[in-house]
Amino acid sequence: LSVSWRPTDRLHAYATIPRGLKTGGFNEQSFSDLITTAQQQALQAQISGRGGFDSSTIASATTYKPEHSWSYELGARYALPSAGLELSSSVYLMQVRDLQLTRFVASGAGRMVGNAGSSRTLGFELSATQRLWSSLRAHLNYSLTDARFTEETAAAKKGNFVPFIPRHTYSLMISANEPLSRHLRLLGEVEYSGLGEIYWREDNTTRESLQSTLRARLGLSYDRYTLALWGANLTDNSYTVFQAASPLGRLFQTSAPRTLGVDLSVKF
């Protein structure tokens, strides 16, 4: 369901209520663990003379259910071309049932998808662009996401944050694409961006705080050719971009260090 309203040429408001579905499926990587468990229980049954592997658990151990969601969003866009101004913002609510999350299998040698109960997400997004002078523009983007479990599970308490979803993401950028002559253009941009905090586990015992990085790019374009110097993570900030617990230990992926480069591109 979608409704839009345009009271003026500059203002556009809208409301949407979509329904989402992620299909269920099978976890192929969990079969090796299942076979190992069956062999161990069969051996124990031979020794003790009782028990054994319960084949009725195969379906629950290797499959996961579909994820269903309802989303409700209200938003507006405003443009004032004469002043070089563009604004947009939205608020939304998402309710999810049988949330699908990726976890490691018991042996640690693979991953599987599992259902993690229900969740709700409240969000706010803001985007703005302002022309400062000629082709020089300022850009602002911000997003607030509050995603929490709405029921208690074996791994998470009600009210815990859903893992791998940053609460804040933002970007402040200055960009320019200025003609110097008929064939020559000056290109440049500087961006300060960040995200966090992020929880890595359903029990919320590990997290990464808000982290920011700075990047820049400066170049010249002549007809089909562009030469640019660039730098990423100029402040050389070191932080965790991914973390997961497995039976083999805790796995980390850290941010790339300060990186400098040169690009040469040709348009055909």
Question: Residue spans of the language-model regions?
Answer:
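C-terminal beta-signal and adjacent terminal beta-strands/loops
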Residues: L21, S193-R201, G219-F268
